Amino acid sequence: MTEPIVVGRIGRPHGVRGDVTIEVRTDLPQRRFALGAVLGREGGGAPLTVAEARWHSGRLLLRFQGVEDRGAAEALRDVLLTIDSAEAGPPVDDDEDAEGEGGDIWWDRDLVGLEAVTTAGATLGRVTDVIHAPAGDLLAVGRPGGGEHLVPFVREIVPTVDPAAGRIVVDPPPGLLDLD
């Protein structure tokens, strides 16, 4: 297995037959969580095979083979589900610009670890996480002295992403870096 990619996190059980809620962390949930899909567990453990998948009130519910009651489902809470990076294919751009063109796209793992600098050349720190919030993606940038900046991951604020050079350039609006 090559490097695993986290595609979801198991949440709380739903009902009494072993269903669990899923915090989706992938571009194509319909493909990643299809019937029969085999998902790894970050940190090890037996793989989980999707026996049933459905959406309920805006949440993805899964049932895995061999997980047949609420107790077994509860034991899976907070497990991070992974796929093999070789199976992932290219990331999918579901955002288009005003001209209908897709933008540059990256896997989260391509961004974590990049140095973040301002357009003036000041070092902000390193990207430690990509947070997929309902209002949009945020880059968590760990500051050298501790703490972090949360930077909206939009072209206007992060005009340059260069994984080959190991850095991103941030053009912060006034006050963004003062908010902690």
Curated annotation (Swiss-Prot):
Magnesium in keyword set: no
A family per Pfam: PRC_RimM
Listed name of the protein: Ribosome maturation factor RimM
Single Gene Ontology MF annotation: ribosome binding
Role summary: An accessory protein needed during the final step in the assembly of 30S ribosomal subunit, possibly for assembly of the head region. Essential for efficient processing of 16S rRNA. May be needed both before and after RbfA during the maturation of 16S rRNA. It has affinity for free ribosomal 30S subunits but not for 70S ribosomes.
GO cellular component: cytoplasm; ribosome
Residues covered by the PRC barrel domain: 103-176
PANTHER family: RIBOSOME MATURATION FACTOR RIMM
Cell compartment(s), UniProt: Cytoplasm
Protein family membership: Belongs to the RimM family.
Domain of life: Bacteria
NCBIfam families xref list: 16S_RimM (TIGR02273)
